[in-house]
Design a protein with these regions (language model features):
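Beta-propeller-forming repeat regions
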Residues: 1-226
Length: 226
């Protein structure tokens, strides 16, 4: 069986080392099969205009991998954001944010760090409402599920499930820039699900700032699904 060859996942141009010059950033990977969006053995290449190259093996594999350059740390030059999806039932987001300094890649944050920050406790409130509390900030958000059946007939004959809905790990991630801002933040979304993954009741949406020594939650909101 012939092994699949490396394919280009993405190419971006930007100043990633603060020298005020543009570098070419290339992300490569090996597809599972021809035409597949699942990539493994990911490699990042920093290509200088004088033809010098630095290559790095990235411990990363997944679907729909994307490369993005932007200043997340408010340092005046770009960092390297790699995102993808795990696929499968949960289909959670995969994330690596790197900075390039002294010809080396330094990991700033990954999906595990973000997931550890965005933990929640859910509980029933009165009159058909569910409380969703952020363990990081203590803020409580309310989800109205009045009149909505939270369980399938085969799971639980009681009118209320034994345990409240849960908040999934991070499902989507977007780099965003606020008006009049000179740096990027990360917008993250997590599904609020009932007894099965297909029962999506709502979504937690969080914006995280990375300009401090630790990631800071800038804002959080709950999105109600009808």
């Amino acid at each position: 069986m012939m092994e699949n060859e490396q394919s280009v996942i993405g190419i971006q141009y930007g100043d990633v080392d603060g020298d005020y010059k543009c570098e070419k950033i290339i992300l490569m990977g090996i597809p599972y099969e021809e035409g597949s969006s699942f990539m493994s053995e990911v490699e990042l290449i920093v290509h200088y205009m004088d033809d010098a190259k630095f290559k790095f093996k990235i411990d990363f594999s997944g679907y729909a991998i994307n490369l993005f350059l932007g200043d997340f740390l408010q340092e005046g030059y770009d960092q390297i954001l790699i995102t993808g999806q795990s696929g499968g039932n949960g289909n959670y987001v995969l994330t690596r944010l790197y900075k390039f300094e002294q010809n080396r890649l330094k990991l700033v944050i990954d999906d595990e760090d973000l997931s550890n920050l965005l933990q929640y406790q859910t509980f029933y409130q009165n009159d058909g409402q569910i409380g969703v509390q952020s363990l990081a900030t203590g803020a409580v958000f309310t989800l109205n599920v009045r009149g909505r059946r939270l369980t399938s007939p085969g799971y639980n004959p009681m009118p209320q499930p034994f345990s409240p809905p849960s908040v999934s790990t991070i499902n989507t991630i977007y780099p965003i820039k606020q008006p009049y801002s000179n740096y990027y933040t990360l917008q993250l979304q997590q599904r609020i699900i009932g007894e099965v993954n297909a029962d999506i009741l709502g979504m937690m949406q969080t914006v995280i700032e990375l300009t401090q020594l630790v990631p800071v939650i800038q804002s959080q909101a709950i999105v109600q699904f009808s």
